[in-house]
Amino acid sequence: DYVYSSTCPCSLELAEHARATRGQLATPHSQRSVARLSVVLTDEMALEDLIELARDAIVTETQVMVKREDEQAFAELNAANPIFVEDAARLFCEALRADPRIGDFRVIASHQESLHSHDAISLLTEGPTFAADSLDPRLFQGLIHAG
């Protein structure tokens, strides 16, 4: 699993509109997000290479510990890269597809919503390996907030 943060593009646009038209301070909502990447390798690949591939696709990987100024820089990075869950899944797919060491793959992206009472999930597969079990509910364990 690759854990990243995502800012809702709609929420960001509405916050900017409120600030521009009414001078109202509004904060776009962002949330912790998880991409579960499953791959079939056609050649050797270190786990670190797969992690780097995910980091290159979505640059807002969550941080374990940050200083206050680093937290602000991360908030700015997050706001500069708003993304819907479907678009995040597509970016991961593009990165996986571009690596010749990767054959079939499955991407499950989950944006664990901070505003809505539901999570947003996108699932994409490439090749026959993962197609048959792509809707098995066990795939989503740990990706869905149960609360």
Please provide the spans of the model-predicted regions:
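N-terminal intrinsically disordered, cationic/polar leader segments
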Residues: D1-G147
